[in-house]
Amino acid sequence: MGKEKGHINVVVIGHVDSGKSTTTGHLIYKCGGIDKRTIEKFEKEATELGKGSFKYAWVLDKLKAERERGITIDIALWKFETPKYNVTVIDAPGHRDFIKNMITGTSQADCAILIIGGGTGEFEAGISKDGQTREHALLAYTLGVKQLIVAVNKMDTTGWSQARFEEIVKETSNFIKKVGFNPKTVPFVPVSGFQGDNMIEPTTNMPWYQGWQKETKAGVVKGKTLLEAIDSIEPPARPTDKPLRLPLQDVYKIGGIGTVPVGRVETGVIKPGMIVTFAPAGVTTEVKSVEMHHESLDAGLPGDNVGFNVKNVSVKDIRRGNVCGDSKNDPPMGCASFTAQVIILNHPGQISAGYSPVLDCHTAHIACKFAELIEKIDRRSGKKIEESPKFVKSGDACIAKMVPSKPMCVEAFTDYAPLGRFAVRDMRQTVAVGVIKAVEKVAPGAAKVTKAAVKAGAKK
């Protein structure tokens, strides 16, 4: 088999009509996890329904419909392979909870693929002032997705026009520059997600197209197709050298074993024998064993979803939203308040001090109060526009002091990114997103230290 391929997550963004589904469907269909049987089944249905031209989007529509009906479809269906990577496509936007998912980070994207509809008027609609495209690109950038690929889709509907492609590249470059990306590091690929041009094989319909290029630290990288552009994503550094942070998703009580917290390692490493602290619960204990997919591990690494057995801790002591860390290496703590840069996305009214919506940060789901609006800032440059504003509204960005209604554990984005970004939820939608700048931490009072931890500590 040789060396296992690296794993990367991509998020596909773009206007609803840009052909996102067709393009994503095409990659998954040609390089991916959909087995032949499923495809044959879909093709048969498509033909029966008179969709015989078998749009790739049909594959994706089927997957989406199944997901929305709550049938958990095999996540493999959202995967495809490039020569270098196993790629997972993160929930395509347009889906209600997309923003929340992107922030609470079931999976942080390593790269965003922006799909632009090349047809007349489409491109303009997607990038207009209120366009979703702008919002998604800005969100991706704010939340730390620093690599971008632009696919100019539907080139077949433009008569494979070089002029149209160049016009879109120029406009899009300006647009992404305003968001914060450097266009020189971004491959621009003219494709037809429907006909397959430049998706996997180089096109024969655009003799003028010389290929894409992008600047990287290692020099200029060149290629022709979208698949090659995805293959040229720089591998993410997985933060194993940082102190452990593992937000709990659930805590189980398992007969004969005991208490088993479950969650995804965000930073650092968890190993059997480690003395860990749970914040804000203030419980310290020893890790007896660590396992993933029912196999025991010597170590759980960033990105691993693990269960681990802890000694002398009741299920009542710790819960979802708590964060587990190494008691001897920057242990996690609860916080009294934190300062964050908040971007208001869609709130019907005005937000002023005292507003108390629910925050989703990693696995925690807790009401927090906007205690003070410190300053209103320009959302692109971060420069101050107004000191102590009375209120902020949709489209504004501000620095705010937030106070959680009950103990919670968060971190500054620059220290531990996955624990430093949050979604503000109200009226069943994401009204704002935030990035935490600084945290006022609280040392636990009379913390519970289990006998196992004391014993293990004495041994060392």
From Swiss-Prot:
Native source species: Schizosaccharomyces pombe (strain 972 / ATCC 24843)
Domain of life: Eukaryota
Task performed by this protein: This protein promotes the GTP-dependent binding of aminoacyl-tRNA to the A-site of ribosomes during protein biosynthesis.
Region annotated G2, chain positions: 70-74
UniProt protein name: Elongation factor 1-alpha-B
HAMAP family: EF_Tu_A
Residue sites binding GTP per the record: 14-21, 91-95, 153-156
Subcellular locations according to the entry: Cytoplasm
Gene: tef102
